């Protein structure tokens, strides 16, 4: 039974494939979890959409499910936090509360031609100084512009103030706090920073970019901090303060207690996202990284990060399993790889659809190099795992070149952190300890922490740091000479992946 004196915080994690609600206690331990998937809609090649109404319905269901599993009443929740898939874009009718079109998902590439046109002679760098981002189809601003130009009559309605724009956090907060009956139309700095419409210095919408993209200011939410009470929930959560919003990767930074300059976390999923806390000033990147918001606590100074995104890490293990059939389950790769001492001279560069950070080479394609008759499937299994470690090393090196900050440890989360061989190799190639926390749900935990800070459940960042607990630590054991030799070979393999795909027109 729940402790009546205990304080509980709920967090909604609205992700690309599913929505979850996790309830945490005051110690940061998980009390209950509920999760539901939603549909992926693919109207055309390269197009990916979600039904925002379905997402809201699933979010309501997982909140109810988590509360029921915890044996709690809604009035026992001290706060509600939100974390979300970043960049996914919703436009809705303020009067009816209904979306005017399916949400355009971050993976969707329909705005590639529009981005190419917007870039003009400056190319991808046109808005980088103001936003920290390259002009690319991932980000929300071009998605909103596309909707305004392609849904009949929408632009005129938007200019009259009838339409609301938001990333998923805004859509959820608006609905949670009343929707058409007084719902709050807000976003936080981490999500606004991924629209390519917010100025990183002022933390306000940049009117010159709005003008260039032809997005009317009337549709935009108010930009707020990541940790403050935006409003009070109605409905099943009636009276609960809605008190945080963070993009998913920034929420993981917060949940991993990366509050000091130089602290970093890497989330290992289908791909990987490595974020480094660079403090209260944005650090521009000359090495293929994104300059992004980390978080902002109430009226305190904002914290910025450098972000390196790696397209293929866990997905390479899936390919090894599903396309090659060498293993039957993802977990088998560790046993197979551990049966040999090294990669036998083989390297696999998983540039299946190009390389992300730090190269951003859309012409790259996957290669296997260094093959001899000595190489076995076990060596290839090891090369699959090592590809993740080496790609992470390249991002860490780029972060040092941009910021001058050397990481001293790397905090890790995500499914691949269960693989001890991979985590040991990661520590070896970075030359620093790699640490996995006891609570693995760092994204939800970060949203809960930020909401609890805003409502007095926790007092300050020092208290949150004291809750963070280590589960496993891997320390480097590789000689520097071996590390340097292997890294040199990896870099040679990467060069072999360039120039394979010749594009017709705009990618």
Swiss-Prot record:
Q: Which residues form a coiled coil?
A: none
Binding sites annotated in the UniProt record for ATP: 16-18, 270, 314, 318, 415
Activity control mechanisms:
Inhibited by fructose 1,6-bisphosphate (FBP).
Output the GO biological process annotations, alphabetical, semicolon-separated: glycerol catabolic process; glycerol metabolic process; glycerol-3-phosphate metabolic process
Pathway assignment: Polyol metabolism; glycerol degradation via glycerol kinase pathway; sn-glycerol 3-phosphate from glycerol: step 1/1
Q: Name one GO molecular function term.
A: glycerol kinase activity
The keyword ATP-binding appears for this protein: yes
Give the Pfam families listed for this entry: FGGY_C, FGGY_N
| Swiss-Prot/TrEMBL catalytic activity | glycerol + ATP = sn-glycerol 3-phosphate + ADP + H(+)
Quote a single Gene Ontology cellular component term.
cytosol
Show the NCBIfam families listed in the entry: glycerol_kin, PRK00047.1
Protein purpose: Key enzyme in the regulation of glycerol uptake and metabolism. Catalyzes the phosphorylation of glycerol to yield sn-glycerol 3-phosphate.
Report what the protein is called: Glycerol kinase 2
What species does this protein belong to?
Streptomyces avermitilis (strain ATCC 31267 / DSM 46492 / JCM 5070 / NBRC 14893 / NCIMB 12804 / NRRL 8165 / MA-4680)
């Amino acid at each position: 039974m729940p402790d009546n004196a205990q304080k509980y915080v709920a967090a909604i994690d609205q992700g690309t494939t599913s929505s979850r609600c996790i309830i945490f206690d005051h110690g940061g331990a998980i009390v209950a979890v509920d999760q539901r998937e939603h549909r992926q809609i693919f109207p055309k090649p390269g197009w990916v959409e979600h039904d925002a109404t379905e997402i809201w319905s699933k979010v309501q269901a997982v909140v109810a499910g988590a509360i029921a599993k915890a044996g709690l009443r809604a009035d026992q929740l001290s706060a509600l936090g939100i974390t979300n898939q970043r960049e996914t874009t919703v436009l809705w009718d303020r009067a009816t509360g209904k979306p005017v079109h399916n949400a355009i998902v971050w993976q969707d590439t329909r705005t590639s031609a529009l981005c190419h046109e917007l870039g003009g002679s400056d190319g991808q760098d046109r808005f980088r100084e103001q936003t920290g981002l390259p002009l690319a189809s991932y980000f929300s601003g071009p998605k909103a512009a596309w909707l305004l130009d392609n849904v009949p009559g929408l632009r005129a309605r938007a200019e009259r103030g009838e339409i609301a724009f938001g990333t998923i956090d805004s859509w959820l907060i608006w609905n949670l706090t009343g929707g058409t009956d007084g719902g709050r139309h807000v976003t936080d700095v981490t999500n606004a920073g991924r629209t390519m419409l917010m100025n990183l210095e002022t933390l306000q919408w940049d009117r010159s970019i709005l003008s260039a993209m032809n997005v009317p200011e009337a549709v935009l939410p108010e930009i707020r901090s990541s940790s403050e009470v935006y409003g009070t929930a109605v409905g099943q959560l009636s009276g609960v303060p809605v008190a945080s919003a963070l993009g998913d990767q920034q929420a993981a930074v917060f949940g991993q207690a990366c509050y000091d300059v130089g602290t970093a976390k890497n989330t290992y999923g289908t791909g990987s996202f490595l974020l480094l806390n660079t403090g209260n000033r944005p650090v521009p990147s000359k090495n293929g990284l994104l300059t992004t918001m980390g978080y902002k606590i109430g009226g305190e100074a904002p914290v910025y990060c450098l972000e390196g995104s790696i397209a293929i890490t866990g997905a390479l293990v899936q390919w090894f399993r599903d396309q090659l059939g060498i293993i039957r389950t993802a977990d088998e790769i560790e046993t197979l790889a551990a049966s040999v001492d090294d990669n036998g001279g083989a390297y696999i560069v998983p540039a299946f659809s190009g390389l992300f950070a730090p190269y951003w080479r859309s012409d790259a394609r996957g290669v296997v190099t260094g093959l001899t008759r000595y190489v076995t499937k076990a060596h290839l299994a090891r090369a699959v795992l090592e590809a993740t470690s080496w790609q992470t090393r390249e991002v860490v090196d780029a972060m040092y070149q941009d910021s001058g900050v050397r990481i001293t440890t790397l905090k890790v989360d995500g499914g691949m952190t269960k693989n001890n061989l991979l985590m040991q190799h990661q520590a070896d190639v970075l030359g620093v300890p790699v640490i996995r926390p006891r609570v693995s749900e760092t994204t939800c935990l970060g949203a809960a922490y930020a909401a609890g800070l805003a409502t007095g459940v926790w007092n300050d960042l020092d208290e949150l740091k004291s809750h963070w607990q280590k589960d496993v630590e891997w320390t480097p054991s590789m000689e520097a000479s071996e590390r340097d030799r292997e890294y040199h070979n990896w870099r040679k393999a990467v060069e072999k992946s360039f120039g394979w795909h010749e594009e017709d027109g705009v990618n």
